[in-house]
Swiss-Prot record:
Organism: Mus musculus
Name listed for the protein in its UniProt record: H-2 class II histocompatibility antigen, E-B beta chain
PTM field: Ubiquitinated in immature dendritic cells leading to down-regulation of MHC class II.
SUPFAM superfamilies associated with the record: Immunoglobulin, MHC antigen-recognition domain
InterPro entries associated with the record: Ig-like_dom, Ig-like_dom_sf, Ig-like_fold, Ig/MHC_CS, Ig_C1-set, MHC/Immunoglobulin, MHC_I/II-like_Ag-recog, MHC_II_a/b_N
Cytoplasmic side: 247-264
Keyword annotations: Adaptive immunity, Disulfide bond, Glycoprotein, Immunity, Membrane, MHC II, Signal, Transmembrane, Transmembrane helix, Ubl conjugation
Beta-1 as annotated region, ranges: 27-121
Entry similarity comment: Belongs to the MHC class II family.
A single BP term in Gene Ontology: antigen processing and presentation of exogenous peptide antigen via MHC class II
Stretches that traverse the bilayer: 226-246
Length: 264
């Protein structure tokens, strides 16, 4: 194996190794066969009270070398990274530079991005609905949709009649919207009974108090009665509006009439 010494993690490096057997090989296939890249991560705990720098080197999607500021030196993850680890660990000045990047890079960038990233808060929108409109006492999936929030750390819990549900919960995990907001679905598998109240509770840094949204299990007859009541109310409003319209129109017509014999 030929070892090619690499530079520190300052940019992604693409190595194109092409075997040229026939003269036109490069023309037919010039895709990159081997990819080497580096990924720098700054981990913050309680603001900048504790900061950890993690610098990871990959070759063809496999990590082979890393620098961990908690350790203070390079560590070979695979044999491929051992020559570089030994080379860089033998350079005291270079190691001191890497250790100092906890302050010169991580804490420095934290202070710059503090206002528009660290302190940014967007409140979540929470809705609750069942996936099926079938009668009660049948298996159903209640969905708590939490969308458009930032930052991503969020806690979603389900309650039934005030008691937290620990089992039957499925989540999509955190989904990035691509606009600096997140969304997630937290679902509860259950068999709703008449009169039960299900509550989705959401806690997020943007909220001073948890947000709770309820879903009440109702029988078909109760739903029909409610719909009939709503329909009757809407119908009553329509008749009231029509009556008022006719009344005011007649009043306007009468005020416009003039007694006969008067000159204008």
């Amino acid at each position: 194996m030929v070892w090619l010494p690499r530079v520190p993690c300052v940019a992604a490096v693409i190595l194109l190794l092409t075997v040229l057997s026939p003269p036109m090989a490069l023309v037919r296939d010039s895709r990159p066969w081997f990819l080497e890249y580096c990924k720098s991560e700054c981990h913050f705990y309680n603001g900048t009270q504790r900061v950890r720098l993690l610098e990871r080197y990959f070759y063809n999607l496999e990590e082979n070398l890393r620098f961990d500021s908690d350790v203070g030196e390079f560590h070979a993850v695979t044999e491929l990274g051992r020559p570089d680890a030994e080379n860089w660990n033998s350079q005291p000045e270079f190691l001191e530079q890497k250790r100092a990047e906890v302050d010169t890079v991580c804490r420095h960038n934290y202070e710059i991005s503090d206002k528009f990233l660290v302190r940014r808060r967007v409140e979540p929108t929470v809705t609750v609905y069942p996936t099926k409109t079938q009668p009660l006492e049948h298996h159903n999936l209640l969905v708590c949709s939490v969308s458009d929030f930032y930052p991503g750390n969020i806690e979603v819990r389900w309650f039934r009649n005030g008691k937290e549900e620990k089992t039957g919960i499925v989540s999509t995990g955190l989904v990035r919207n691509g606009d600096w907001t997140f969304q997630t679905l937290v679902m509860l598998e259950t068999v709703p009974q008449s009169g039960e109240v299900y509550t989705c509770q959401v806690e997020h840094p943007s909220l001073t108090d948890p947000v709770t949204v309820e879903w009440k299990a109702q029988s078909t007859s109760a739903q029909n009665k409610m719909l009939s009541g709503v329909g009757g109310f809407v119908l009553g409003l329509l008749f009231l509006g029509a009556g008022l319209f006719i009344y005011f129109r007649n009043q306007k017509g009468q005020s416009g009439l003039q007694p006969t014999g008067l000159l204008s």
